[in-house]
């Protein structure tokens, strides 16, 4: 026996699991069979494990594993066999039961049966496929990954080779893995025959059913001679001819989802990500889609296409005719469908390999499916190079007659030498790109879609020419010059009959969702042979080319240019994220709108300025010079106000539409500047009327009367001047915080009429103008001749003086109002509560003091601030952590008392709450109603006695009961006695002024005046003349009161009766009679 030597297996053999009790056949140099369990390679002196020892080791491991399972009561999952191990297990199952005995390590060797060898063995390198002798068999039949090295010597350790013995009974192989070794992934097994491709389920809606086409592609392999019906690939590399498969994607036109999607065949290697450009410089485009358009009534249509040869520099055309028949029998629920597509062909020769790429079917009006990526941009061809045009057709529905679609293509400008097809998806959004850009952001050769205007004739629509006054004319790029530019593409659609509106709308809606990256032109025409047509031509400037758009629309169909353009606006869809969109430049839009406004204003006022339009003014005297200065400065002032309103104010309103400014910001900046503009427009014609008077000597126009007449209008400057400082602060904050606002105002500043003045300089003009009016009037008064004895000159000077005083008063009042507003704002800022600003609105600030002390209930004093305004009294106490504000309306104050004895320099303010005032008013109303009832039931009694003694009259009235109201009081202490007296006087005067202004002030009448005994003594002896002499008797009233006992017999009974009736009246009637008597006596 030879000495067995073993060696550890290499790491690549760690996953080997040789079966139990197997014999190994070793092919020696002498072609003899040796039955051995261990083999030694003497040349390499490398020790190898024999099969028997490995099997024994596996048995031991299996027993240990079973013992562990029994102890833990766990069942380990068995390995699923695949590949060669599966074949071995199948072979063991086919053997008879007699072969299941286990062979020992000393059993004679035997070869595996021939069926096993023919199933799993590979043919030896000798090349004899029919020789099945043991010398030609590989030693790794049962374990294809194991390596058992040959013995090059005939004898091992000098021992003779034993003779071959008959083969024992074959044993059952057990390919269990070793639990101690981590098995790597198994090498891939041969791929089985692939089944046919599945398709997506049929849509539930039968109306959306599509015509599907099945393509059987043949794959011819020269080595295996296998025919596959999945791919039509002819591999030229290694004697294989490869053909790219023709994928027919069928979807519905106008829908955003694909109904049938083929599944790509599996590849051994993952497909690389799509690249927009290949290494050879050709465009790699994904397969496009052949879409179908369902319709109910479709007649046979002939679609003609004209294409250009890619190799020729001149426009050579080839005509392809596609005929679509509608004689297709379809179920009642499924309408017939049309398949209309682009066909793009690319022919490239690389290393004698003919590859047909991009044999795709798609529709011009259908977007890509959601599973595909964005189609790449077309490769740009060199100048004067002609690119092939994809065959296109437009899906039509409800077409009564046969439309003809003709496509003519001219060369496209591009800087690459290789001619390249333009993808259908790149051409289809030209209409969308042309019509969906915002009007303000489009620069159509200096024009805009908003400039489209209908002419007087009904057969044409022409765009209006751009204004020559536009300061920013558009220029044509150098590449667009006639010498460098190439003619554009034209797509013309001609129809002999009327087209339904639904067709046009569906066509427009489909086009609006497509993206177009090619620089081509589109011409759409749909005309009627029996009716007049309307033609619209617009020259538009895109990024790199002009688009000539010609639209022939039948007016009988109710279509219009505005409807056609509005229907091509961008619509949101699932593919909208992949569309190429133009960004909206707000700055450009605003500048264009300002240019339009500037053009309008300059056209309305053809003359540059009002000052240049003034007639010549006589300035021979100093008085005329001052008047000339007033008129000229007023003309310039109006022009400046127009710049503010027409340009700056207009720009601010436009920026508010884009939320760059708010309406509150605009009001705070410009205030009531429009009112001031209209005041000046009213004053300016009056000033112009006095110019002819200046030509006459010794005549002075009554200019002062103009200012007197407009004195109330000048008071509108008050609110503007009071908020001017705040408006400048708001404007500066907006300019500093927003760059767009700053740029827009800077652009307005650069316009000619602005004269390089910013908005801050214009906003101060009204303030300067109002303050200049009194100065000019003062100069006019100085220029007047000295007063003479004439009444006219004296009256003239008086009017001038009056107008001057009035204008100065207006300015002072405005300045005082500004100062008052500043004080109010400082008060609001100091108090700092929420409602204080609203309560201080429309208040006049009178005085304040922060040295007043308030007496609390405990006896201590707190320093407070006392504010006296026109209608309220504020007591503000600023605590450490909290502010206390007490607001007392002046109308609620009952009295102010000097409490010097109780509190040094102290005053007490007694007032009512609002609730108490309401209750008091309600009680007064009830009392008045009760007194009215009593007076009606029991009238006052009057007793009149007429004797020789003086007459006495007694009147008794029911007085109203007084109402007891709980009053509140606040005790304050001033700094000194003088301040106390001043505060007492000021508060009392403010209360009385408020009562007078509101009409609640009552004059007290004493009881002596009410109970006066009126005795009229008349010296007239005629009783018939007493009624005519009442005035004379009243005139002598004061004298007759001292002589009551004289002429008693001459008392007129009528006078007594009149006096008695007057006594029955109320106190107001008595007072009126007394006043009448006094008036007559005077």
Swiss-Prot record:
Compositionally biased region (Pro residues): 185-206, 262-276, 367-379
Cellular component, GO, one term: cytosol
Domain DH: 622-817
Low complexity bias: start-end ranges: 20-29, 62-71, 96-109, 116-160, 170-184, 211-244, 282-366, 450-473
Compositional bias of kind Polar residues: 1-15
GO MF annotation list: guanyl-nucleotide exchange factor activity
Keywords: Guanine-nucleotide releasing factor
PH-like: annotated span: 838-994
Chain spans, region Disordered: 1-29, 59-78, 91-394, 438-488, 504-524, 920-961, 1017-1060
Short name of one Pfam family: RhoGEF
Function summary: GTPase-activating protein.
UniProt note: domains: The PH-like region is similar to the PH domain but contains an insert. It is unclear whether it is a real PH domain.
PANTHER family attached to this UniProt entry: RHO GUANINE NUCLEOTIDE EXCHANGE FACTOR 9-RELATED, RHOGEF DOMAIN-CONTAINING PROTEIN GXCI
Name under which the protein is recorded: RhoGEF domain-containing protein gxcI
Source organism (scientific name): Dictyostelium discoideum (Social amoeba)
């Amino acid at each position: 026996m030879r000495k067995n030597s073993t060696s550890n297996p290499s790491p690549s053999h760690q996953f080997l699991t040789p079966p139990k009790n197997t014999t190994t056949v070793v092919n020696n140099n002498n072609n003899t069979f040796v039955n051995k369990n261990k083999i030694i390679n003497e040349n390499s002196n490398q020790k190898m494990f024999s099969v028997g020892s490995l099997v024994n080791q596996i048995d031991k491991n299996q027993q240990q594993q079973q013992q562990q399972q029994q102890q833990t009561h766990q069942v380990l999952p068995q390995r699923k066999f695949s590949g060669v191990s599966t074949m071995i297990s199948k072979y063991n199952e086919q053997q008879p039961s007699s072969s299941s005995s286990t062979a020992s390590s000393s059993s004679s060797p035997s070869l595996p049966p021939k069926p096993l060898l023919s199933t799993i063995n590979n043919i030896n390198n000798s090349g004899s496929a029919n020789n099945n002798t043991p010398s030609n068999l590989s030693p790794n039949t049962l374990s294809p990954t194991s390596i058992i090295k040959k013995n090059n010597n005939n004898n091992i350790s000098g021992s003779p080779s034993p003779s071959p013995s008959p083969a024992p009974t074959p044993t059952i192989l057990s390919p269990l893995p070793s639990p101690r070794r981590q098995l790597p992934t198994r090498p891939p097994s041969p791929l089985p025959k692939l089944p046919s491709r599945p398709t997506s389920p049929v849509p539930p809606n039968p109306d959306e059913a599509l015509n599907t086409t099945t393509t059987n592609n043949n794959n011819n392999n020269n080595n295996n001679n296998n025919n596959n019906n999945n791919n039509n690939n002819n591999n030229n590399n290694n004697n294989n001819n490869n053909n790219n498969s023709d994928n027919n994607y069928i979807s519905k036109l106008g829908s955003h989802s694909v109904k049938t999607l083929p599944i790509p065949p599996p590849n051994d290697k993952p497909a690389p990500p799509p690249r927009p450009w290949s290494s050879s410089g050709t465009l790699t485009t994904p397969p496009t889609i052949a879409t179908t358009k369902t319709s109910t009534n479709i007649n046979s249509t002939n679609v003609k296409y004209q294409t250009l040869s890619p190799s020729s520099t001149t426009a050579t055309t080839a005509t392809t005719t596609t005929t679509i028949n509608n004689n297709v029998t379809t179920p009642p629920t499924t309408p017939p469908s049309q398949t209309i597509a682009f066909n793009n062909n690319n022919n490239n020769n690389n290393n004698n390999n003919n590859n047909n790429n991009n044999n795709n079917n798609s529709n011009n009006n259908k977007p890509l499916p959601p599973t595909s990526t964005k189609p790449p941009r077309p490769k740009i061809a060199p100048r004067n190079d002609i690119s092939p045009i994809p065959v296109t057709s437009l899906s039509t529905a409800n077409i009564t007659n046969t439309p003809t679609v003709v496509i003519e293509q001219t060369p496209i400008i591009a800087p690459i030498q290789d001619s390249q097809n333009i993808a259908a998806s790149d051409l289809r959004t030209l209409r969308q790109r042309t019509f969906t850009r915002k009007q303000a952001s489009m620069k159509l050769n200096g024009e805009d879609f908003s400039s489209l205007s209908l002419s007087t004739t009904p057969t044409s629509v022409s765009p209006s020419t751009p204004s020559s006054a536009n300061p920013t004319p558009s220029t044509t790029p150098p590449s667009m010059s006639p010498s460098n530019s190439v003619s554009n593409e034209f797509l013309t659609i001609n129809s002999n009959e009327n087209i339904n509106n639904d067709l046009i709308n569906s066509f427009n809606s489909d086009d609006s969702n497509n993206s177009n990256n090619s620089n081509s032109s589109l011409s759409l025409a749909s005309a009627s042979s029996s009716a007049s047509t309307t033609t619209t031509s617009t020259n538009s400037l895109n990024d790199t080319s002009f688009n000539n758009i010609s639209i022939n629309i039948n007016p009988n169909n109710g279509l219009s240019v505005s409807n056609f353009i509005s229907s091509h606006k961008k619509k949101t869809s699932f593919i909208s994220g992949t569309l190429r969109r133009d960004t909206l430049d707000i700055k450009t839009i605003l500048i264009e709108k300002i240019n339009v406004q500037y053009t309008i204003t300059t056209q309305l006022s053809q003359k540059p300025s009002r000052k240049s339009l003034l007639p010549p003014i006589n300035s021979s005297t100093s008085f005329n010079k001052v008047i000339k200065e007033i008129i000229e400065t007023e003309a310039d002032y109006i022009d400046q106000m127009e710049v503010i309103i027409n340009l700056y104010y207009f720009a601010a309103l436009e920026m508010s539409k884009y939320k760059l400014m708010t309406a509150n910001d605009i009001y705070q900046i410009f205030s009531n500047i429009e009112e001031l503009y209209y005041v000046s427009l009213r004053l300016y014609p009056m000033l112009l009327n006095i110019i002819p008077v200046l030509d006459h000597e010794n005549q002075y126009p009554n200019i002062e009367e103009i200012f007197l007449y407009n004195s109330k209008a000048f008071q509108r400057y008050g609110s503007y001047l009071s908020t001017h400082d705040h408006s400048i602060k708001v404007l500066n904050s907006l300019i500093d915080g927003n760059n767009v606002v700053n740029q827009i105002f800077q652009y307005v500043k650069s316009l000619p009429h602005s004269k390089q003045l910013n908005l801050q300089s214009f906003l101060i003009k009204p303030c300067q103008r109002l303050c200049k009016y009194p100065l000019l009037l003062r100069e006019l008064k100085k220029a007047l001749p000295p007063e003479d004895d004439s009444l006219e000159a004296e009256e003239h000077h008086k009017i001038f003086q009056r107008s001057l005083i009035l204008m100065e008063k207006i300015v002072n009042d405005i300045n005082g109002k500004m100062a008052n507003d500043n004080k109010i704002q400082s008060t609001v800022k100091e108090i700092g509560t929420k409602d204080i600003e609203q309560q201080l609105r429309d208040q006049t600030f009178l005085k304040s003091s922060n040295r007043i002390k308030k007496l609390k209930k405990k006896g201590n004093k707190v320093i407070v601030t006392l504010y006296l305004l026109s209608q309220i009294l504020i007591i503000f106490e600023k605590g450490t952590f909290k502010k206390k504000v007490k607001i007392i309306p002046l109308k609620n104050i009952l009295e102010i008392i000097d409490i010097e004895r109780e509190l040094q320099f102290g005053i007490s303010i007694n007032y009512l709450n609002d609730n108490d005032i309401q209750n008091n008013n309600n009680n007064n109303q009830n009392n008045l109603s009760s007194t009215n009832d009593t007076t009606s039931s029991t009238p006052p009694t009057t007793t009149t006695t007429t004797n020789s003694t003086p007459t006495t009259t007694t009147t008794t009235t029911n007085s109203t009961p007084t109402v007891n109201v709980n009053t509140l009081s606040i005790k304050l202490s001033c700094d000194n006695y003088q301040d106390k007296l001043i505060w007492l006087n000021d508060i009392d005067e403010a209360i009385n002024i408020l009562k007078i202004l509101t009409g609640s002030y009552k004059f007290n009448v004493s009881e002596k005046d009410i109970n006066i005994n009126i005795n009229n003594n008349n010296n007239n002896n005629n009783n018939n003349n007493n009624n005519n002499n009442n005035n004379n008797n009243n005139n002598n009233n004061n004298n007759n009161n001292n002589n009551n006992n004289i002429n008693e017999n001459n008392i007129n009974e009528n006078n007594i009766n009149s006096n008695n009736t007057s006594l029955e009246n109320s106190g107001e009637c008595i007072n009126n009679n007394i006043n009448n008597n006094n008036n007559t006596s005077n």
